[in-house]
A protein has these predicted regions:
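N-terminal intrinsically disordered, low-complexity, charge/repeat-rich segments that act as generic
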Residues: 1-18, 31
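Conserved catalytic core of Hanks-type protein kinase domains
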Residues: 9, 34, 93
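Glycine-rich, flexible loop/turn motifs
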Residues: 11, 21, 41, 109
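Short, hydrophobic secondary-structure boundary micro-motifs
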Residues: 17-19, 43-44
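Active-site nucleophilic cysteine motif
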Residues: 18-38
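Residues that form or immediately flank small-molecule/cofactor binding pockets and catalytic motifs
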Residues: 20, 104, 130
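Glycine- and charge-enriched low-complexity intrinsically disordered segments
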Residues: 116-134
Length: 134
């Protein structure tokens, strides 16, 4: 099993559209940072202030860099539909049923995937093809 690099120093960091750290992140920027800490270069997709554009960018890139899986492992990307019509959010699975993420009005947090608010919004689990075998 892979081990997600320590991320406790990221908890509480603020949200910023297009944020790639070190002081602020958007949801995909946080994923990029976690992969960087694990020694992996996650491809960065053009960030935009339009949440629909962010989701579309990831989904287009996912075809080349990620494979959809059914059971999450550490460092898998979980996509969520938080807006009514499209996928617009992601988090990184950190094990034990938990994921780390950030949203526009929520600083970096680690939450339980099984809570109703997140469980019914999940739209897919994606594994980066560049991850070493588990």
């Amino acid at each position: 099993m892979r081990h997600v690099p320590l991320y406790t120093d990221l908890l509480g960091k603020p949200f910023e559209y297009g944020g790639r750290g070190p002081d602020a992140f958007d949801c995909y920027g946080l994923a990029v940072e976690l992969y960087r800490r694990a020694g992996l270069a996650l491809p960065d997709y053009a960030s935009t202030d339009d949440p629909a554009g962010q989701g579309a960018g990831f989904m287009h890139g996912a075809e080349h860099h990620f494979q959809q899986v059914n059971i999450p492992q550490e460092l898998d990307i979980i996509l969520f539909q938080v807006l009514p019509r499209f996928v617009s959010h992601c988090g990184v699975y950190v094990g034990h049923g938990r994921f780390i993420h950030i949203m526009s009005k929520i600083s970096v947090a680690c939450e339980d995937l099984a809570t109703p608010i997140w469980q019914h919004r999940q739209r897919g689990i994606y594994r980066f093809k560049g991850l070493p075998h588990a």
